[in-house]
């Protein structure tokens, strides 16, 4: 994977982690460092505690029977995982968690996390807001997957990436502040790398996007006009 975190996005979240309610968790846990591409948690593993991403980006993914990776979501600073274990819905992790950049991860006992959550309404509100953002992101991702045509899948996954990682540029385009290869995008929507490359080139010819190496720029007004989904234009998750 070739993701690179965009600093303007992570600065906001990391400030929340350092100075907001999340800092109440830090005294109860131990921080570990994970190098880029290292697995933080394996599918089927029983986590030893609650994990809080302090800095960096983590990819959540599964592997198909054919051995292909399928990206489920991306986690940023302040996110708590694996949520299914944190809140008692599963004993084991349902997915793999891999560091996309160098990461700092706080590990604390689940009992300490739950006790702090029950006593700290500000922390509870921040976690609620985080999960609502992830829920909105998930619906946008699912909507992209539901389209039958490859180009439509890509248009809607670009819409999701803009909402999650978009940075407006002086020229009016929106930069997706992740370093993305064709393979990375293909894994998000279940396409082959070859099909993804062809369809992205067609979108570039239509001037919906431009890209250089691993950087993507999206013409959001034209993208919205193409999809007719103006309700998504100002979504930020």
Question: What spans do the regions from the language model cover?
Answer:
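Phosphate-/nucleic-acid-contacting segments
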Residues: 163-237
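Cyclic nucleotide-binding regulatory domains
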Residues: 13, 38-102
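Short loop/turn motifs at secondary-structure junctions and domain boundaries
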Residues: 23-24, 41-44, 170
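Cyclic nucleotide-binding regulatory module and flanking cytosolic helices
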Residues: 1-36, 80, 85-88
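Polybasic "coupling" helices that flank or enter modular domains
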Residues: 121-188
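Cyclic-nucleotide recognition modules
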Residues: 21-22, 73-136
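A conserved hydrophobic position in a structured secondary element of the catalytic/binding core
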Residues: 53, 75-76, 108-109, 180, ...
